[in-house]
Amino acid sequence: MASLINIGVSGLGASQSGLFTTGNNIANADVAGYSRQQNVQSAKSSIQSGNVFIGTGTTLSDVRRVYNAFLENQLRTTTSLNSDASAYLNQVSPIDNLLSDADTGITGALKSFFTALQSASAKPTEDASRQLLLTSAQSLSKRFNTISAQLNEQNSNINGNLASMAEQVNKLSATIAQYNDQISRVSAVQGSPNDLLDQRNEAVRQLNELVGAQVVEREGNFDVYLANGQPLVLGKTINTLETVPSKTDPTRMSLQLNRGSTSMDITSSITGGEMGGLLRYRSEVLDPSMNELGRIALVVADSINQQLAQGIDKNGEFGAALFGDINSAALISQRSIAQAGNSAGAGNLDVTISDTGKLSTSDYQVTFSSATQYTVKKLPDGDAQGPYDITATPLQEIDGFKLALNGGAPSAGDSFKITPTRNAAAKLDTVLTDPKRIALAAPLSAVSGSGNQGTGVITQPELTSKLDIYDSTQRIDLQNGLKYSTPVKLVFGDETTNPQSYKLFDAKGTELSSGTIIPGESNTLQLSVPMVDASGNPIMDGVTQKTFNFEMTVAGSPKEGDNYTVSLTGAGSADNRNGQAVIDLQTKATVEVGANGKGISLTDAYGKLVENVGGKTAQAQMDSNATNALQTSAKAGRDSLSGVQLDEEASNLIKYQQYYTASSQIIKAAQEIFTTLINSL
């Protein structure tokens, strides 16, 4: 009887364990990372009875996790990829909308500015149209400022998110190390701790949501490594992540791995997870977009200011700048960042924009090999240019900018990050406040002599000597020369000779130059005028008198004595030729201008930026969809094996209930047999 009762009791125990395991599966059905468990039963040792062996019941040999390491690793990998793609998409989508939308992007503001410029140029004497142009210029500069502010805010958010995620990574690393410790201790004496193993797996999966990590199982422990092979967790030991300002750019946070007393920058090697997506977005979209937007802002300010300086305003004065000076003392000092660790006596570098048409959208690394010699490398992986001499005259031009020392001399090994265009959009401002100061008129105007008899016709003179707003000496000399060396008079000789002669005289009647034309044809005259100051003294360039040059076309047949007077354009002129020249900047190749003079326009440059960001956004959406599908598939694969199927567990409940009832019947039968036996005595 004892054997039959023991068999029944073993069945009761096994069925009860089955009910416990099934109930535990059902209770944890929605717990992330939980692997369903199965009871593993085995028959107890049989006993010999005569020449046969009779069973003695069952025993619970194990409660097994239904687990597959390959499926778990696949889920971790796809989780990392999807988190990366989602983080990237979440960052790039709003910027794509910002740049491409007509109400928030630059295209609409740029179009409105040039439309207002066309109106002002069509009515150069009206103050209302000039005021509208000023308002449009202010709107344009504010639009640049607003977009730049949002890009900078996004950078700040990325910095904050990286710091927060680094803390989460450290907490998860510590959790994994604790699980390693607990699992090692429990496994040594009590077998496999299923729930701890599941919880450790889930912690690793959550870690992969933040950063791509690989697991190597060693003696029951999980060693966790980053993509570059640097360890986060080694058994019970963890290495911590920390965000610190980048040594080359303190406005960008970098990631540092702390291993005991040593630290290393691992920013460039972080891939996967939200961190990888944020860093990838920052390097692929955010920084290039800020640089491109800044380059466009620099070209807008420089090209428009340069052209307006060539003209005459409504007051009869030389043109004033519409936008702020792109090479102000404050701006040239903000384009260079001294690397942390430079020698104590080293100052910084001043970065002067010398040719906006040659600017790229890259940042640069400048490294000194001595106090004066340096090389320049286009980031992130360009070839080194140079060496150059920082004290050379003139200064070396590099992709449209020049470098000069600001402060103490550097030492060998000192390095600087150069950001020629990074902050330009934020600094663009409209400085002109008086609409009368907008220089829409060309500087020189010509009138025909009142007594002219011939059929000669001239075009208005075009000043071919260009004023440089960044060279104060050249600018002042040319303005004085135009002001005090005019008017000049062009007088034609005997019309019966062919070619017909002409002479150019100054205001005192002194002959300046002479030449000939072919009567009846279109003749382009290139004329040069020696420059004098307000006192009539020559304006000199060393030992040579400076001149300004202009050209005009003469057609028809002038009579002898016919003349044309070329003067500085006066106040209130209806001339709009300089305004038209500014309008032409809308389509003129002013960006990425190569040695052959070919480039792209402002509108095309911004369109290229929008197209690039739009392309990145479209690719990010496809990547997000693809990685989401992969993650969903990986999770489904894992859940199909390890997940709790409630229908199956409900069936198991019924099975174990029946098992329990049947086992109790065995005991009941044993009791009845025992009772019958007792009663028969």
Question: Predicted regions span which residues?
Answer:
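Structural signature of extracellular appendage/secretion-system components
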Residues: 1-681
